[in-house]
């Protein structure tokens, strides 16, 4: 809302005050607009675990700060010791958040093979947030296939 304060003039050297003119009320109108930005992206958790039964692993990206405007962030998977194309399908893209949207899921296909995998991992990384937006930790998360 609008902010007001009183301004008083006193001790004028070499000048005179007009009667009833030495005090004024100043009003600052709240007319600011929200900039495109002013928030951050991060993963909800730094690690996720998924069974090697096929299907998808889901990781959650959260948007913090102002959600009044649309914003976007890019993502991609990277191999740690799980093999892309054998254990999981590499994915990349851009998540587009609508106004007032604070979370989105990334689905990563997990591939079932004939080898019993235990503890194989890959990462999902966030990059390139919209102008004015930042990345918060964790901006990289590890998915472990058990």
Model-derived features with residue positions:
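Short boundary segments that mark the start of a structured unit
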Residues: 1-146
């Amino acid at each position: 809302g609008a902010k007001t304060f009183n301004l008083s003039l006193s001790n004028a050297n070499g000048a005179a005050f007009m009667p009833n003119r030495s005090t004024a009320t100043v009003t600052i109108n709240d007319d600011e607009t929200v900039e495109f930005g002013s928030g951050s992206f991060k993963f909800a958790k730094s690690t996720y675990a998924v069974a090697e039964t096929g299907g998808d692993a889901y990781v959650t990206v959260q948007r913090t700060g102002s959600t009044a405007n649309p914003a976007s962030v890019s993502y991609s998977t990277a191999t740690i010791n799980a093999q892309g194309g054998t254990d999981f399908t590499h994915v990349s893209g851009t998540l587009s958040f609508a106004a007032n949207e604070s979370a989105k899921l990334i689905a990563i296909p997990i591939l079932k093979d004939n080898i019993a995998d235990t503890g194989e991992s890959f990462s999902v990384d966030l990059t390139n947030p919209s102008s004015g937006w930042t990345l918060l930790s964790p901006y990289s998360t590890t998915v472990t296939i058990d």
